[in-house]
């Protein structure tokens, strides 16, 4: 399925039905009085997060979504039927904002999360509401209100635990194929990956994480060069970034250190928070370096790159070092989840709140 991560739509809620100005007409009842019912409420437009959907492609082609109008009221005190709501199912991770003002409206981060995008108009009043001691046969009624109408921008940020970044042909697609169930296109030319790929990595019966591969970055990506700039947003929600570097390029004129520095610079230009995110260095294609020279080449790279974080040496093609990398990632993600759960438990437990209050200065 083609991956679409951005769309623009218009949502139109239904108009409320008009009230009825009807009089009761019945044999042997001379002054029946008013019996006009109210109009029905217009249908609303709702958005629902669905984990079974992973693209916004449906909204690229169906751009206008209109709910039903409410039916008008009728005589005999009959109220009009309310218009049916419509439900727009969107991928988890969709950000909804106002297209004209840019104001954020919602961030659908949980499966089943539901939000009203456009409220249906209220129905008009029938003439039974205008009866009084001085007006026994009112002819007044009100029309239904217009439903809300909005132009919206939908933007999808994939929810993954691990994000891959690197230059084109660094081996990202090969790695995600080797360690997960994803099957992206792999070829020996730049920008083989044209859209993000998600894969599930399983390191045990009940232990797994989601990994995302985005198109390769090049220098100037933050300003729009290449393809990767369109997908950098997907890295903002990952728990850890794997910076993949081709340590043994075929072209001798390519400097792996310069490529690695360029990637970091592009992250900084796009979003400073991406640079601060936990990032691991993964040196790929180490099998292309003679074993007796491997240690020296890796040490020289780390020294020139001035890297002080975790380092993994792998070959995505042969699988060398991939298991070690996956288990380390799973252990790290598990520890982060435990810390987060403990923090949430403490925040919800009144005993910890009382302790914090006791320690606070008077």
UniProtKB/Swiss-Prot annotation:
SUPFAM superfamilies: Obg GTP-binding protein N-terminal domain, P-loop containing nucleoside triphosphate hydrolases
Annotated EC: 3.6.5.-
Sequence positions that bind GTP: 166-173, 191-195, 213-216, 284-287, 315-317
The UniProt record lists the keyword GTP-binding: yes
Gene3D superfamilies named in the record: GTP1/OBG domain, P-loop containing nucleotide triphosphate hydrolases
UniProt key word Transport: no
Domain of life: Bacteria
GO biological process, alphabetically ordered: ribosome biogenesis
Residue ranges of the region described as Disordered: 129-148, 340-362
Subcellular location, record wording: Cytoplasm
Keywords of this entry: Cytoplasm, GTP-binding, Hydrolase, Magnesium, Metal-binding, Nucleotide-binding
Residue intervals of the OBG-type G domain: 160-334
InterPro entries tied to this protein: G_OBG, GTP-bd, GTP-bd_Obg/CgtA, GTP1-OBG_CS, GTP1_OBG_dom, GTP1_OBG_dom_sf, OBG_GTPase, P-loop_NTPase
Positions with biased composition (Polar residues): 130-141
Cofactor(s) the protein requires to work: Mg(2+)
Assembly notes: Monomer.
General function of this protein: An essential GTPase which binds GTP, GDP and possibly (p)ppGpp with moderate affinity, with high nucleotide exchange rates and a fairly low GTP hydrolysis rate. Plays a role in control of the cell cycle, stress response, ribosome biogenesis and in those bacteria that undergo differentiation, in morphogenesis control.
Family affiliation: Belongs to the TRAFAC class OBG-HflX-like GTPase superfamily. OBG GTPase family.
Name of the protein in question: GTPase Obg
Organism: Polynucleobacter asymbioticus (strain DSM 18221 / CIP 109841 / QLW-P1DMWA-1) (Polynucleobacter necessarius subsp. asymbioticus)
Taxonomic lineage from the root: Bacteria, Pseudomonadati, Pseudomonadota, Betaproteobacteria, Burkholderiales
């Amino acid at each position: 399925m083609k991956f679409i991560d951005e769309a623009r739509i218009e949502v139109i809620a239904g108009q409320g039905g008009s009230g009825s100005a009807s009089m009761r007409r019945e044999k042997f009842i001379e002054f029946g009085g008013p019996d006009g019912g109210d109009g029905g409420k217009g249908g609303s437009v709702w958005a629902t997060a669905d984990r079974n959907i992973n693209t916004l492609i449906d909204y690229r082609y169906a751009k206008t979504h209109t709910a039903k109008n409410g039916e008008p009221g009728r005589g005999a005190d009959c109220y009009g039927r309310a218009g049916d709501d419509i439900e727009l199912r969107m991928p988890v991770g969709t950000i909804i904002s106002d297209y004209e003002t840019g104001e954020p409206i919602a961030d659908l981060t949980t499966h089943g999360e539901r939000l009203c995008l456009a409220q249906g108009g209220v129905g008009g009043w029938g003439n039974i509401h205008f009866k009084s001691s001085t007006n026994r046969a009112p002819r007044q009624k009100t029309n239904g209100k217009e439903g809300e109408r909005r132009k919206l921008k939908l933007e999808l940020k994939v929810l993954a635990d691990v994000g891959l970044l690197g230059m084109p042909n660094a081996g990202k697609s090969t790695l995600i194929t080797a360690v997960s169930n994803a099957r992206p296109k792999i070829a020996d030319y730049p920008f083989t990956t044209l859209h993000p790929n998600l894969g599930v990595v399983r390191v045990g019966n009940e232990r797994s994480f989601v990994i995302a591969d985005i198109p390769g970055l090049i220098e100037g990506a933050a300003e729009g060069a290449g393809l990767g700039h369109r997908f950098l947003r997907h890295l903002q929600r990952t728990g850890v970034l794997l910076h993949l570097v081709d340590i043994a390029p075929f072209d001798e004129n390519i400097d792996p250190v310069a490529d690695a520095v360029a990637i970091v610079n592009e992250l900084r230009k796009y979003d400073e928070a991406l640079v601060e995110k936990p990032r691991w260095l993964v040196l790929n294609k180490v099998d292309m370096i003679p074993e007796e020279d491997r240690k020296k080449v890796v040490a020289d790279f780390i020294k020139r790159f001035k890297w002080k974080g975790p380092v993994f040496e792998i070959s995505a093609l042969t699988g060398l070092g991939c298991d070690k990398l996956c288990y380390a990632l799973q252990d790290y993600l598990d520890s982060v989840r435990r810390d987060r759960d403990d923090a949430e438990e403490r925040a919800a437990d009144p005993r910890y709140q009382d302790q914090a209050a006791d320690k606070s200065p008077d």
